[in-house]
From Swiss-Prot:
Its EC number is 5.6.1.7. It is an enzyme of class 5 (isomerase). Keywords: ATP-binding, Chaperone, Cytoplasm, Isomerase, Nucleotide-binding. InterPro entries: Chaperonin_Cpn60_CS, Cpn60/GroEL, Cpn60/GroEL/TCP-1, GroEL-like_apical_dom_sf, GROEL-like_equatorial_sf, TCP-1-like_intermed_sf. It is found in: Cytoplasm. ATP binds at residues 30-33, 51, 87-91, 415, 495. It catalyses: ATP + H2O + a folded polypeptide = ADP + phosphate + an unfolded polypeptide. This is Chaperonin GroEL 1. Transmembrane segments: none annotated. HAMAP family: CH60 (MF_00600). It comes from Chelativorans sp. (strain BNC1). Its main location: cytoplasm.
C-alpha cells in the first residue's frame, strides 16, 4: 500500500478552500446575461467555448491532491444540480463557494463546525419555504418563452422555439436537441407515435415522389412473432378486403412466402397493405407493441394470451386515421384507442420511471411516455462553425431543462433577486451562538449570485444589492442586460423555482461537509527513481 500524506484542521481546510476557489472562480465568470465565455482546450480538434457551468467544472483537475479534493467536491454540486434541475449549475457553484468561505472564517475563529452546519441547514430550510410561497405558476406560452430566453443567455429565438415545441408536444412530450447540418436553427415536430422501423419492401410505397407508404383510415394487426406463411391469416385478410380499408401489419418479421404474397396482392390492387417490423428488442418490443395496441384500440396477437392468428377478428385490430411509412420510420397518427386506457398506460409508465435505477431504462421509458402522451419535437441547432454550434447547443439544452423545471414548480423573480429577498426574510433562531452564526452564513451567502451577476455586467455589486434591498417590492430587481432596475417578472427576467431551490440545497449540502472536515488523506506523489547508468559503449581492448 502506497504511503499517504495526512493534513489536519486549519492546514487541511486552507488547501481545500484554495481548490474550491480555483474551480468556482473559473465557473462564476459565466453567470448572468453578461457572463463571459470559458475556452476549454481539447486533446484533438478545435478548442470548445462554453458558458455552461457544469461543463467548465468537469474540465478542472488540479495538481495538488488536497486542493483537487476541494475542487471535486464543488464539481459534485454542479453535477448534482444539473442531474436534478438541468440548469443552475453556476448559481450552485457560486453559493457553495460563498458558504464554504464564510464557514471557513467562522471555524478559524473557533466556532463549532457541527453547530455551524446545523445553523446552515435551519436557514436553508426556511429559504426553501420562502421560495415555495413566492413561486408563481406558469400559465402562458409567453412565460415559457421568457424562462427559455433567460436560460439561453438572452437569445429570444431559442426561448420562442422551446415554447412552441412544448405547446405542440405537451409537457410530457420528448424534445430533443441535435446539431443541424445548416446554419439555421429550426424546429421539427412529429405528430403521433413514431418508431424507427420502415417498410419491409419498397413495393408497399404509395407515394413514389416522397418514397413513403401512406395509408388512410387503416386497420393495424399487431403480432409478436414472425410471419412466414399467410395461411393462418386468411380469415382476417378476407374480412379486411371486404371492409375496403387498408391494413398495416406490425410483426417481429414478415419473410419469405408471406412477404411475397402480400407484395403480389398489393401490386394487383386487391389489397391495400404494408408491413413493418416491430420496434425494439426482447421485453422492450413486447412493451412497445402493447403501447401501440393501447394507442390504436387493438390487441397484440400473442400466444402467451392464448390468441391464435386464425381466430383473429376485425374488432381485435387497432385502427388509426393515418399511417405514414418511410424507409426507416413509421408514424401512426390519431389512433382510435380509448382516452382512459391511454391515461392508465401513461400512469403505469410514469411509476416505472420513478422506480427504475438505470439511466438507460429511464431514457427509454421517457421516450415511450412521450410517444403515448404527446409527440416528439426536435430542435436542430445551426451555426456558422462547429465551435459555435456546440456552444449554442449547450445553451439550448440548459434552456430546455430550465423550462421543464419552471413548468413543474413555477417561477420566481430572476437575476438572483429571489435569494436576495430571502436573505432579509430569514427568521430562524439557532439554539446557541454558533448555530446563529450558521444562519448568518446563509444570510450573507445567498446574496452572492446577485452580486456576481452585477459584477459580471460591470456594475458595482454592493450598490446594486443595496438598491434592490432598499425597495420593498418583492419583484424589484436589477436587469443586468440593460442596466435598469424594475419589476423582474414584468421585464421577463425569471428563474425556475426548482432550479434555485436545487442549487441552494446542493450547495449547502456539500459546503456543510467541507466546513466539518477535520482531516484529509491523499497518496504521496511517487518519487521517480533515477535511471541506472548506461554501460559504456564499444568492446574491451578496442579503440574507437
Amino acid at each position: 500500500m502506497a504511503a499517504k500524506d495526512v493534513k489536519f484542521s486549519r492546514d487541511a481546510r486552507e488547501r481545500m478552500l484554495r481548490g474550491v476557489n480555483i474551480l468556482a472562480d473559473a465557473v462564476k465568470v459565466t453567470l448572468g446575461p453578461k457572463g463571459r465565455n470559458v475556452v476549454l482546450d481539447k486533446s484533438f480538434g478545435a478548442p470548445r467555448i462554453t458558458k455552461d457551468g457544469v461543463t467548465v467544472a468537469k474540465e478542472i483537475e488540479l495538481e495538488d491532491k488536497f486542493e483537487n479534493m476541494g475542487a471535486q467536491m464543488v464539481r459534485e454540486v454542479a453535477s448534482k444540480t444539473n442531474d436534478i434541475a438541468g440548469d443552475g449549475t453556476t448559481t450552485a457553484t457560486v453559493l457553495a463557494q460563498a458558504i464554504v468561505q464564510e464557514g471557513a472564517k467562522a471555524v478559524a475563529a473557533g466556532m463549532n463546525p457541527m453547530d455551524l452546519k446545523r445553523g446552515v441547514d435551519l436557514a436553508v430550510a426556511e429559504v426553501v419555504d420562502y421560495l415555495a410561497k413566492a413561486a408563481k405558476k406558469i400559465k402562458t406560452s409567453e412565460e415559457v418563452a421568457q424562462v427559455g430566453t433567460i436560460s439561453a443567455n438572452g437569445e429570444k429565438e431559442i426561448g420562442q422555439m422551446i415554447a412552441e415545441a412544448m405547446q405542440k408536444v405537451g409537457n410530457e412530450g420528448v424534445i430533443t436537441v441535435e446539431e443541424a447540418k445548416t446554419a439555421e436553427t429550426e424546429l421539427e415536430v412529429v405528430e403521433g407515435m413514431q418508431f424507427d422501423r420502415g417498410y419491409l419492401s419498397p413495393y408497399f410505397i404509395t407515394n413514389p415522389e416522397k418514397m413513403v407508404a401512406e395509408l388512410e383510415d387503416v386497420y393495424i394487426l399487431l403480432h409478436e412473432k414472425k410471419l412466414s406463411n399467410l395461411q393462418a391469416m386468411l380469415p382476417v385478410l378476407e374480412a379486411v378486403v371486404q371492409s375496403g380499408r387498408p391494413l398495416l401489419i406490425i410483426a417481429e418479421d414478415v419473410e419469405g412466402e408471406a412477404l411475397a404474397t402480400l407484395v403480389v396482392n398489393k401490386l394487383r390492387g386487391g389489397l391495400k397493405i404494408a408491413a413493418v417490423k416491430a420496434p425494439g428488442f426482447g421485453d422492450r418490443r413486447k412493451a412497445m407493441l402493447e403501447d401501440i395496441a393501447v394507442l390504436t384500440g387493438g390487441q397484440v396477437i400473442s400466444e402467451d394470451l392464448g390468441i391464435k392468428l386464425e381466430n383473429v377478428t376485425l374488432d381485435m385490430l387497432g385502427r388509426a386515421k393515418r399511417v405514414s411509412i418511410a424507409k426507416e420510420t413509421t408514424t401512426i397518427v390519431d389512433g382510435a384507442g380509448q382516452k382512459s386506457e391511454i391515461e392508465g398506460r401513461v400512469a403505469q409508465i410514469k411509476s416505472q420511471i420513478e422506480e427504475t435505477t438505470s439511466d438507460y431504462d429511464r431514457e427509454k421509458l421517457q421516450e415511450r411516455l412521450a410517444k403515448l402522451a404527446g409527440g416528439v419535437a426536435v430542435i436542430r441547432v445551426g451555426g456558422a462553425t462547429e465551435v459555435e454550434v456546440k456552444e449554442k447547443k449547450d445553451r439550448v439544452d440548459d434552456a430546455l431543462n430550465a423550462t421543464r423545471a419552471a413548468v413543474e414548480e413555477g417561477i420566481v423573480p430572476g437575476g438572483g433577486t429571489a435569494l436576495l429577498r430571502a436573505s432579509s426574510e430569514i427568521k430562524a433562531k439557532g439554539e446557541n451562538a454558533d448555530q446563529e452564526a450558521g444562519v448568518n452564513i446563509v444570510r450573507r451567502a445567498i446574496q452572492a449570485p446577485a452580486r456576481q451577476i452585477a459584477s459580471n455586467a460591470g456594475a458595482e455589486a454592493s450598490i446594486v444589492v443595496g438598491k434592490i434591498l432598499d425597495n420593498n417590492a418583492v419583484t424589484f430587481g436589477y436587469n443586468a442586460q440593460t442596466g435598469e432596475y424594475g419589476d423582474m417578472i414584468g421585464m421577463g427576467i425569471v428563474d425556475p423555482m426548482k432550479v434555485v431551490r436545487t442549487a441552494l440545497q446542493d450547495a449547502a449540502s456539500v459546503a456543510g461537509l467541507l466546513i466539518t472536515t477535520e482531516a484529509m488523506i491523499a497518496e504521496l506523489p511517487k518519487k521517480d527513481s533515477p535511471a541506472p547508468a548506461m554501460p559504456g559503449g564499444g568492446m574491451g581492448g578496442m579503440d574507437f
